[in-house]
Amino acid sequence: GYSSAASDVYKRQFIHFIKYGRGIFMDISSKKEFDLYKDIQNRTDGEVYLGIVGPVRTGKSTFIKRFMDLMVLPYMEDVHSRQRTIDELPQSAQGKTIMTTEPKFIPKDAAEIALEDDTRIKIRLIDCVGFMVDGATGHMEGSTDRMVHTPWFDHEIPFVEAASIGTEKVIRDHATIGIVVTTDGSIGDLPRENYVNAEEQTVQELEEIGKPYVVVLNSTRPYSEETVRIAEGLREKYQTAVLPVNCEQLRKDDVFHILEQILYEFPVARMEFYIPKWTEMLPPDHPMKAEIIQSARTILGGMRKVKDIYAQDFTPEHYVSRMKLEEVDLASVSYTHLRAH
């Protein structure tokens, strides 16, 4: 058949998530849900790095703390490592003042989780300052820029510049998956419009390097009509999943849903087309074979990410009576079987 290969390592991670439905994610103690962690382990060589990025003052640190409380700390066997990880959790607070001052790995050393069959997986989240927004404070000292030392220069640089560089490095160099945390403006004193430029900058960085990502819309009222409307607008704007949640009240099923949606943002690695054997004997310029080839090209042209598989129109052409999507194999490298009759 015809195939479309993907080369980037990011295109092969977390693909196995979709194998299980969202419904089984509610009780992490079940064997199938430990299998979920095992699948992640297989896809990432045992190390999962989630880059929590976005504008400043959106709740990134709050998201990290809740994620660790729900998904990591309860499954750490070593008491001392667990306590050390708790001590390393980021601070968060209400208001306009920037709390995070530099990129930070949470935990400092990746937390190792033991699964039922002695499989082990390392998980680490990466916090960052974020891109600056109008109205935030903490980046100035009086009327001058706050100067800070960074690992990247041998001299002080302005806080805003350091925050931008650090955030870009998290996106480009450290994270395997991006979670963009933004807000509808309900979580603090800054209005929604103040976050838009920094939000767009974050998404642009992720799009440029092709890393899979989703957007978390932090809100004190995630189910309100206004928040849902904003989420739908962002979905249309960025062409990616946007999930309204309250980061302070993040639940386990929220986390699983976020990870599940990330899966749909991974590129399709390969497509296989199956046609009747006898058509393979036809010359390439035969009208029937030419139409089949053109149909394959059309489908491939609209198939970039996993989510595109389910949005694709497999309407048959003149010579093809039926086209059937037979299999979406997400257990290895995410490929699709499409059979024409």
Where in the sequence are the language-model features?
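P-loop NTP-binding site
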Residues: 28, 44, 48-50, 57, ...
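Conserved C-terminal guanine-recognition region of P-loop GTPase G domains, centered on the G4
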Residues: 155-237
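Conserved G1/Walker A P-loop phosphate-binding module
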Residues: 31-143
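Conserved, well-folded catalytic cores of nucleic-acid-processing
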Residues: 70, 131-132, 205, 209, ...
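Canonical P-loop GTPase G-domain recognition
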Residues: 220-277
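A solvent-exposed, charged loop/short amphipathic helix patch at secondary-structure junctions
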Residues: 139-157
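Single conserved hydrophobic/aromatic residue that forms the stacking wall/gate
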Residues: 1-13, 337-341
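Short, Lys/Arg-enriched N-terminal segments with co-localized hydrophobic residues
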Residues: 7-25
